[in-house]
Amino acid sequence: MNYHRRLHPGRCGNGKGGLVNIDCSGNRVAGMIFGPKRVIVVAGANKLVDDLDEAVKRLRRIAPLNARRIKHHTPCVETGKCMDCQVQQRLCNYLTVINHGMKFPGRITVVMVGEETGF
């Protein structure tokens, strides 16, 4: 979970919030986008950023740490920064942005924890 402060149905594009994710296989983001009737996202304050550009920068800065944690063999593990690699174990295959949930109001609930959680 990343950019902006809140996810408000019907307020897309006015700086009220959204969810930005990068995923390796798409299995985590797929369930957020379509599937269950309710989605609850719990995230720490360290995941909040000011805008979409900052969200993507943050994800690319964090991805090498996560790749190292799960023992993927990618260039970013070696260099410590995103190399926009084209290898099979790449973590950054799917970038999703959920701007709002107008189609299904109340389906996504974001619970913010007032401390740092994970990467």
Predicted features, each with a name:
Residues N2-F119:
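Conserved phosphate- and dinucleotide-binding cores of soluble alpha/beta proteins
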